[in-house]
Amino acid sequence: MRGALALVLLGLSMAGCSGPIETRVSSAGEEQPIAGSFMLAPLPDNSADELTGAQALLVEGLLTKGYHHADDADMMLTVGISDRPAQLTVKNGAQILAPGKQPKMWQSCADREYRMTIELTRRADGAQLYSGNASEYHCNATLTETLPSLAKRLVADIERPRGPKLLVRLGKD
């Protein structure tokens, strides 16, 4: 009896740290496969390690999909990341760009929103072939821990941009 009670209490205490993670993906671009060669937009000299890591994760994912990384390529890949308190609403004038998130019941820490953005442009004419962002709310996970999931979602979406969608995975909140 005590053992069962201990397991229930342990499960309840861990419920705030892990569970379903919602990944919000929004994208636009060409609807046909655009695999080819790509080069990376240069990062600022003082770039955070997380940005360099995000870029490396995206390169790895694109290589597995048949893209080719080159110093002089047909396409330019630009990568960005952000980290903000999730309860803040981001606006441009009256337009809400990112609504604030309300805490969940029994939540013991404040959420942060981690976001990765990518843009793939054709170098010859500057045409945008793909633009996408993936974001997640986390209470305990760090930006670094979240980057692999965000990169995976964007790489999976790059050849089939479909506007906004919501995907769910299990992981560290």
Question: Which residues are covered by each model-predicted region?
Answer:
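Sec-dependent bacterial lipoprotein signal peptides
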Residues: 1-17
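Acidic helix-start/capping segments at beta-turn-to-alpha-helix junctions
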Residues: 70-87, 171-173
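A structural "domain/chain start" motif
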Residues: 15-60, 64-65, 164-173
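A short, structured loop/turn motif at beta-sheet edges
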Residues: 32-36, 69-75, 120-127
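Surface-exposed short loop/turn segments
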Residues: 65, 80-131, 161
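Hydrophobic beta-strand residues in large extracellular and virion-surface proteins
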Residues: 40, 58, 77, 116-120
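Second-shell loop/turn segments in exported
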Residues: 41-49, 106, 135-143
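C-terminal/domain-edge helix-coil "capping" segments
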Residues: 18-30, 113-115, 122-131, 135-173
